[in-house]
UniProtKB/Swiss-Prot annotation:
Pathway participation: Amino-acid biosynthesis; L-histidine biosynthesis; L-histidine from 5-phospho-alpha-D-ribose 1-diphosphate: step 4/9
The keyword Cytoplasm is annotated on this UniProt entry: yes
Catalyzed reactions per annotation: 1-(5-phospho-beta-D-ribosyl)-5-[(5-phospho-beta-D-ribosylamino)methylideneamino]imidazole-4-carboxamide = 5-[(5-phospho-1-deoxy-D-ribulos-1-ylimino)methylamino]-1-(5-phospho-beta-D-ribosyl)imidazole-4-carboxamide
Protein origin, superkingdom: Bacteria
Keyword Oxidoreductase: no
Gene Ontology biological-process entries: L-histidine biosynthetic process; L-tryptophan biosynthetic process
Key words, A-Z: Amino-acid biosynthesis, Cytoplasm, Histidine biosynthesis, Isomerase
Protein name, as recorded: 1-(5-phosphoribosyl)-5-[(5-phosphoribosylamino)methylideneamino] imidazole-4-carboxamide isomerase
């Protein structure tokens, strides 16, 4: 299982939000590139980046810093946040981003997702943000009536290989992940599942690894030193 340290970027700073609320911002570092180097130097295999301004349709604010990370860090990065059209996908991939994460358009335009998957294959990842089993869109501001497991199956059908699944009610709350939903997705699909939201302790990491998930994104717990990155990384490399 891959541990993805999360770098959430808002106004060119590394921050964390609580439950996706933009008025609950905690700034951890002024320079996200510095943070990317930190995780790389600690042995990260992959870095997960979210453009929070992009998620709220404030485009271009963090473009340069994301390009700087892609060009300076020689490990793969995946980037999401407000990616809703072909041009944005193309510009991120041209900027050196390894995988692009699509969010709201998976609900709003499944045909476009299929087109992008046909063109970019495994470089396209879909992020499913859910609350009480229903998919949330537009930077978590709107909860739809689409069932998250049903969406997972539809995505698998059109060729998506990897998803990031976030339980919004758990994100940034340090309460532990929603293990049940990960188990169901793993059981009912063959998608590579990256768990996100609420990974709080080394016990959570052990449990997710035991479920044979593809990866886990950890943000707040790393920055608040609830989880030691190297310990989590070692744990995930055991038995592989």
């Amino acid at each position: 299982m891959i541990i993805f340290p999360a770098i959430d970027i808002k106004d060119n700073k590394c921050v964390r939000l609580t439950q996706g609320e933009f008025d609950k911002v905690n700034v951890y570092y002024d320079n996200p590139l510095e943070v990317a180097y930190k995780w790389k130097n600690e042995g990260a295999e992959y870095i997960h980046i979210v453009d929070l301004n992009g998620a709220r349709s404030e485009f271009g604010v963090n473009t340069k810093i994301i390009e700087d990370i892609a060009n300076n860090i020689d490990i793969p990065i995946q980037v999401g946040g407000g990616v809703r059209d072909k041009e944005k996908v193309k510009s991120l991939i041209n900027a050196g981003v390894t995988r692009v994460i699509l969010g709201s358009i998976a609900i709003e335009n499944l045909n476009l997702v299929e087109e992008l998957v046909n063109e970019y294959k495994e470089k396209i990842v879909v992020s499913i943000d859910a609350k009480d089993g229903k998919v949330a869109v537009r930077g978590w501001e709107v909860v739809s009536n689409v069932d998250s497991l049903t969406l997972c199956k539809q995505l698998e059908k059109i060729g998506v290989q990897t998803i990031v699944y976030t339980d919004i009610s758990k994100d940034g709350m340090l309460q532990g992940p929603n293990f049940d939903i990960y188990e169901r997705i793993a059981k009912e699909t063959s998608l590579n599942v990256i768990a996100s939201g609420g990974v709080t302790s080394i016990e959570d990491v052990k449990r997710l690894k035991a479920m044979n998930l593809y990866g886990a994104i950890i943000g707040k717990a790393l920055y608040d030193k609830k989880i030691d990155f190297k310990e989590a990384q070692q744990l995930c490399l055991l038995g592989e």
